[in-house]
Swiss-Prot record:
The gene is citG. Catalyzes the formation of 2-(5''-triphosphoribosyl)-3'-dephosphocoenzyme-A, the precursor of the prosthetic group of the holo-acyl carrier protein (gamma chain) of citrate lyase, from ATP and dephospho-CoA. This is 2-(5''-triphosphoribosyl)-3'-dephosphocoenzyme-A synthase. Its EC number is 2.4.2.52. It holds the Pfam family CitG. It comes from Pectobacterium atrosepticum (strain SCRI 1043 / ATCC BAA-672) (Erwinia carotovora subsp. atroseptica). One of its GO terms (biological process) is prosthetic group biosynthetic process.
Length: 301
């Protein structure tokens, strides 16, 4: 049974499945903004993370550190309540039409981030993914449907069904980094992951996290293991934008090698050094790790 981490970050004592279920159902909306903030904080504080900002170093980044991430999280966290409220208020709108209703909230949330960080993009991917999940949670709750891992991810998939076609397949030029990578490599990035209902998370990361914790790993070790699983399977456009497809192959192969044995923190530190030397940052996998941690605390079905 997953242990339950309360919004204030204090790990509760073991409780029965029925109590966990009641907690999750009762507070699925009331504290979702706190849950998102906790997941984002967990991700940045987790150490060591190859190529990423953590408590040991700034990874392959020269313009951000843990303190800046914390400032960013504080700035964007209140906006996730607005996503949830929008989903709740538009419960009569089909999911396929819901994305346009929350785009202005996403833009405002990004502006809050950029204002707080003085122009540094710390959480654009997180805003996109968590904004969609919060919107879905509000929509499901207003319709009297259960908020579960499956219902959240299925709802996001329905919301983003046409996203790749509308924003990538029809683009005439590479106006954004995502469009450039799609035109050059066929990578759909965060849009494709959302349109798939976060398939990489559901098929790889969540099972890995659940198995690791069931095997007795502490949260930090289980999350580091899960991060490696994500790095091994995620076609991370953050990596490709810095190192091309060769860079992606390097990260994926390295992660697969480490997964072949028990988790070794010294090996993670060496991987960190290797990614920094190549200026590679698996930021997409970091976003998906935070997403995995949030989803883990909801019932599966």
């Amino acid at each position: 049974m997953p242990t339950l981490r309360l919004p204030d970050g204090v790990l509760s004592a073991a409780v029965s499945r029925s109590v966990v279920s009641e907690y999750r159902e009762r507070y699925s909306l009331l504290d979702i903004d706190q849950r998102v903030a906790h997941a984002l904080t967990m991700e940045v504080m987790l150490t060591p993370k190859p190529g990423l900002v953590d408590r040991a170093n700034n990874g392959s980044h020269r313009d951000m550190d843990v303190a800046l991430f914390q400032t960013s999280i504080q700035a964007i966290s209140p906006w996730f309540r607005h996503f949830t409220d929008a989903g709740y208020q538009h419960a009569s709108v089909p999911l396929a039409q819901l994305l346009s209703q929350v785009r202005p909230i996403g833009i405002a949330c990004e502006q809050a981030m950029l204002s707080a960080t003085k122009g540094v993009n710390t959480h654009k991917g997180g805003i996109f993914a968590f904004g969609l999940l919060c919107t879905a949670a509000g929509w499901l709750t207003a319709r009297g449907e259960r908020v579960t891992q499956r219902s959240l991810c299925d709802s996001v998939a329905a919301m983003c069904h046409d996203l790749v076609r509308n924003e990538l397949e029809t683009c005439s030029g590479a106006a954004t980094a995502g469009e450039h990578l799609y035109l050059r490599h066929g990578l759909t990035g965060a849009r494709g992951e959302a349109a798939s209902g976060f398939n990489t998370v559901c098929q790889h990361a969540l099972p890995a996290l659940q198995q690791a914790i069931a095997a007795g790993m502490d949260d930090e070790t289980a999350l580091l293991q899960t991060l490696l699983v994500l790095m091994a399977h995620n076609p991370d456009t953050n990596v490709v934008s810095r190192g091309g497809m060769d860079g992606l192959a390097f990260v994926q192969d390295y992660a697969q090698r480490l997964l072949a044995g028990p988790l070794d923190r010294q090996a993670l530190i060496k991987m960190d050094e290797a990614l920094i030397a190549r200026n590679l940052s698996p930021g997409g996998s970091a976003d998906l790790l935070a997403l995995t941690w949030l989803l883990y605390h909801y019932p599966t079905e």
